[in-house]
Amino acid sequence: MADLQGKAVLTIAVPEAKADQIEAEILRLRAATTEAGSVQLEQFDRLEQVFLAPSSYDVIFSGHIALPAKSHADSALAKLAAALKPGGRLALRESLNSRNETALRSALTMGGFVNVQVSTSEHALEAHADKPVYEVGAAAPLKLSFAKKKQSGAAAPAAQVAEVWTIATDDFDDDDLLENDGDELLDAEDLALATTAPEGDDCEVGAGGKRRACKNCTCGRADAEAEQAAKPTLTGPLPASSCGNCYLGDAFRCASCPYLGMPAFKPGEKVTLSDRQLKADA
């Protein structure tokens, strides 16, 4: 890798990485970036849930602590690309049984990376890729000239184009249009629907005075009630520690850890967090 002095670095560890391995890698990166740079840690299995500020890192390492990472999902690669600064670099390692070089190269290219280099080592599939020097959706000025060009010769006469969409005004009689009755434009089926359609308040009144759809509802209330009943209820377990190293101190905590900034504590010790600490920084 290039010189990391003064760079903002993010390293992503796999769940199998031990505390001493994480600490050694963090110390190595901090020595390389010096005080002018910064080093942050995240966990691979929480990559989809954590917030990574856009265009914040010069270099991102993934799968370089202990074992290589599993296959990076397309959404994860897109998230890492957005977190890199323009011209930033991604260096990742995947297990050999995750996919082949061609598939990884294609995934990185589709994720928005350029200068993709993929190789196979003895223990892992390694890749280096760069983010373009521009942001997606960035605006750039275009040099446009609207000056009239000088004509070399006499202007040719305009071609006579046939007017195919003209209507002669004498084809219609305004009096005939005004005398037409609107009901004459409806057939028997249209009139039957107009007379049998229920009013907006023609629904039955159920318990509690709330209107409900009729058995043969045609006003749309039955569809609205069915759609409301089909809405899913979001349930799921509360987020838990992924790395299990939160109690060791900031050197072992992820950048999005709610315990960040607090002193180390004993395993199993009760620690109370405020509502502000439980909310992720936007």
From Swiss-Prot:
Keyword terms, alphabetized: 2Fe-2S, 4Fe-4S, Cytoplasm, Iron, Iron-sulfur, Metal-binding, Mitochondrion
Binding site for [2Fe-2S] cluster: C203, C214, C217, C219
The keyword Metal-binding belongs to this UniProt entry's keyword annotation: yes
GO process terms (BP): iron-sulfur cluster assembly
Secretion signal span: none
Annotated localization: Cytoplasm; Mitochondrion intermembrane space
MF-aspect GO terms: 2 iron, 2 sulfur cluster binding; 4 iron, 4 sulfur cluster binding; electron transfer activity; metal ion binding
Region feature (Fe-S binding site B): 243-257
N-terminal SAM-like domain, as annotated region: 1-140
Positions annotated to bind [4Fe-4S] cluster: C243, C246, C254, C257
Assembly: Monomer.
Similarity comment text for this entry: Belongs to the anamorsin family.
Protein name as it appears in the record: Anamorsin homolog
